[in-house]
Amino acid sequence: MDYVRAVSGALLITLACTTQVAAQSVIPGPGTTTAIQGELQSAAQTPPQQTTAALVEFICPPGNLLSSDLQTRCNEIAIGVLRGTDTGGALAGLQGMAPEENSVIQTIEVDGAGSRDEEVRKRLERRRKKNQDTEAITMSLNGRPLTPEEALGAERGGGASADYPYGGRWGVFLNGNFGFGDKDNSARETGFRTNSYGVTGGADYLLTDQSIVGLALGYTRQDTDLNADSGFLETDSVSVTAYASYFPSARSYVNAMLSYGHNDHDQKRTIAYTIASPFTQTGTAVINQNALSDTTSRDIGGSLEGGYDFVRGNWTLTPYGRLNVADSSIDGYTEHMSDPTGPGSGLALQIEDQSFTSITTAFGGRVTTVYTGERFDLFPQVGAEYVHEFDNDNEDTRGRLVDDTSGSIFLLPTDSPDRNYGNVTAGLTADFRNGWSGHVLYQGLVGYKDLNLNMFEIGARLQF
């Protein structure tokens, strides 16, 4: 569950190469003097406004190869500030032009990968603990403590699967999940509300009494509404995860996972503002456009975790440490306007490819107890972990206005990632004597600035 980015101090403007001109200029960000004397940047109140203000100052002077609509929108903003006729409308226009909503995809990428990995980790934990439950279930029968052999025999049952404390070498599982969360607005990025639902299924095999390998497939749908009705993002994700576990002893383990996810994104960015305009009969221009686009992204990640179980009676404390590495890439995309001939039709953007890497460590612990019954055993569990982000450095969003044929590039700053945060979990597992088991799980993100995420999961498993 993660993450966001940071601010850059420069705006790069690249002039398109022609037979006469091949040049590249670097224009520092806020404070730069341009043909409009930096007035728009001085009036700008947020980093996205400052970025688009610098761009408008650079491309607005006539003759810079703009479409008619884009030239008109630039002129309205410049006049609104320079003449003081509508500074508020001009600032709304600058904010509307900036694609700060683009950062939502980055947040969705890491959130989805983190939830997916947690499902598989819980699967490995229960599969492994089948071997240890007999130790925790050294309960009494009619007041007499059971011997380890008696407890093991009760846990194994009869049939071919009784040769293995897991209930059999093969295991299959199916999980369903539902998640929700929100992110507050910041100076650089638009906040959002999100919900998701998905399903993950897989199978694993007990290679030896000390090792398991498995494969899981997953699908997730996530719907995200941006604050202030400024747009939405719909994401469909499919994933495959290979996993393995090795336990040198009955109480220690090492887990490894490698996953790949493919994500399809459909998004709408709403551009809506009103500004005084000398170019309309009414003296006012009403911009109400939806910039539509779709793109794909991919994430590949791996994790390595080790832990040890300290058992006392029916209670087990499991401290652990984990290393996570994830690399994500988002394809560039080009927007098209909902009203191609209406005011604001020239404000479509083209966003370049993006990529980022996350490297985190997690240190935490889980506490589990057991309540035994005649037909099944219950295993309540709570856990918490501290996560530190080492990488995921800010990458500004690079893009250009589609109707600016000069090819001028803007760099839009984004939020810094939160380097330190936590996850909490609570769950209940029921293991039945016939090899079936079921569980419910809650996972929550805590201590992450401006971001709240929650996930609930229900699942069933069978060993045979």
Regions found by a protein language model. Give the residues of each.
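Solvent-exposed, glycine/polar-rich loop segments of beta-barrel outer-membrane systems
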Residues: 186-195, 224-231, 264-296, 329-357, ...
